[in-house]
Amino acid sequence: MENSSSETLHVEDLQTEIMSWLPLKSLLRFVIVSKKWASIIRGEQFKALYLRRSMTRPRLMFMVRRIATLPPEPEMVWFQSFCKEERCIPGQLEVEFLFHSVYQEKIPYFSSGQQQLRVPPNTNYTSVSQPIGGLICLQSETKFALCNPGTKKSRALPDIQAHEKAFITSFLGYDEATNVFKVLCLTMVWAHEPSKRVYEYQVLTVESGVESCSWRGITCKEKDHTPETQGLCKGGVLYYGARSTSDHRPLVMSFNVRSQEFTAIELPDQLHISYFWNFVIYNGDIALVNESDFDPRVVNEPNGNKVFHIWVRDATAQEWQRTRIEIPRWEQNVGHVDYVFRGTTGTKELVFAQDSRHCEDDFFVLYYDTFTKDLRRFQIGVTGPKISVRTCLDHVDSLWLM
């Protein structure tokens, strides 16, 4: 009897180990065909194991805004009615989001493990967070939803209470140690006199297996500020560029997802971040990139090489270091097409994506190997006219929201 029980446990462990390496589409099928497998896959222990394994095979995520030409996907029909409070203007073209991802380090590049999800159009402006922990946060004015592009599962979140004239900015953070997501929302009610402007900071906590959640006000002990860049979450800390409302100085704000504490990170005097700056991961560290440095009108080196500088945050020394990067034969290989630096892969390859403001029917990504000096070009495989494309590294598969 004991041997039979031991053998059963061994078989279950083996099944769990095998399933933890399978693609999401296979697990979604297993959930349907077997109650036993569904119980394993939806268990918290397996979800955590699968997320850890997924981090070893990260994805490149493309967030494409384009004209909607197809009916909404069945899994996302609810989002259209969830956000749409006004009817579309007759004759107005509707814009949808397409989330397209591929394995960023697996050969053959850009054709391994393709996933796509189309989010239907709505009349209000929709903003999309940086992917973290396999999820993205969709915001349409005061409405929010979490979405898992890999499983095509979504969850509507409570509306935030804000003044009708408030400017609302949101970020998505994730704490790996506690397995908790938090949506950070900053609202500002604008007034001509700075002293009369009202700033509020609120957080929504989302835990696995917990259905109810609500917005809670928190205190920012640092200076009141207005966000100026997109956010990036790393190691349980959310970073975003901002400007102090008191002296208008640029700074970087960090938000500890677990403790919910803000910290203002001062910048060197020569570093003036604005809307054109973006956060990336450079060889494992947080870095700031000025996207205007990649304007094709900026003259490259006389030999045709591309030289640009980024500011890397040294976590140990707690300081910013200006880093010079040179790409040989850039003009010869790239010409006058706009490409922007998006960070490095786990294999330390530099990734450049076409400027989303000037994308055409075809959209390409460059990989530069710092050891072999090879510069390779890949097409993302999304056809049709695009309004904009946002490229994010290190997206992962996750079983959240299943």
UniProtKB/Swiss-Prot annotation:
F-box domain residues: 4-52
Pfam families: F-box, FBA_3
InterPro entries documented for this protein: F-box-assoc_dom_typ3, F-box-assoc_interact_dom, F-box-like_dom_sf, F-box_dom
PANTHER family per the UniProt record, alphabetical: BNAA05G37150D PROTEIN-RELATED, F-BOX ASSOCIATED UBIQUITINATION EFFECTOR FAMILY PROTEIN-RELATED
NCBIfam families the UniProt entry points to: F_box_assoc_1 (TIGR01640)
UniProt protein name: Putative F-box protein At1g70970
